[in-house]
């Protein structure tokens, strides 16, 4: 069973930045290449599947991030019960994995989400990463996978 518990219960505040963990929520990795796969995701989630690099889409309950031409990251806006999380995962598994359109992997207990707020966020992120964040400063919902020296962060979502 997935572990939705978190060891982090603290928020750190500094003069120009605030760091906190987002309460554990549903996170699912989706992989597939066919047009049928992309269409099925949109239909099952009632969300437009982003197909362009560095984009995301959302509805009132879910967010879907483009990670690569054949990979997406789905997460819930709010904490949802284990019963609802299992229902959504099983629904996607039955409609995608069972019919061999792609893969559905629940990564809720593998990844954490950290909320960074403040006036110097882009400067902080740019300090250890070669990615140019200037194009993202005015873009809502932009995403990018980034690497920091010996640490790989799967995705940064800017909202």
Q: Regions from the language model: what does each represent?
A:
Residues 41-56, 122-147:
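Internal amphipathic helical hairpin motif
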Residues 149-155:
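Conserved small/polar residues in nucleotide/adenosyl-binding loops
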């Amino acid at each position: 069973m997935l572990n939705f518990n978190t060891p982090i219960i603290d928020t750190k505040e500094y003069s120009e930045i605030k760091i906190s963990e987002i309460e554990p929520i549903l996170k699912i990795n989706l992989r597939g290449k066919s047009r049928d796969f992309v269409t099925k995701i949109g239909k099952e989630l009632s969300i437009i599947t982003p197909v362009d690099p560095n984009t995301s889409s959302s509805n009132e309950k879910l967010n879907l991030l483009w990670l690569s031409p054949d990979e997406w990251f789905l997460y819930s806006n709010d904490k949802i019960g284990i019963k609802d999380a299992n229902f959504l995962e099983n629904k996607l598994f039955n409609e995608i994995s069972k019919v061999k359109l792609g893969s559905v992997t629940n990564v809720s207990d593998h990844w954490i989400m950290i909320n960074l707020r403040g006036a110097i966020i882009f400067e902080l992120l740019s300090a250890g990463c070669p990615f140019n964040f200037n194009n993202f400063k005015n873009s809502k919902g932009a995403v990018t996978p980034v690497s920091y020296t010996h640490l790989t962060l799967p995705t940064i979502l800017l909202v």
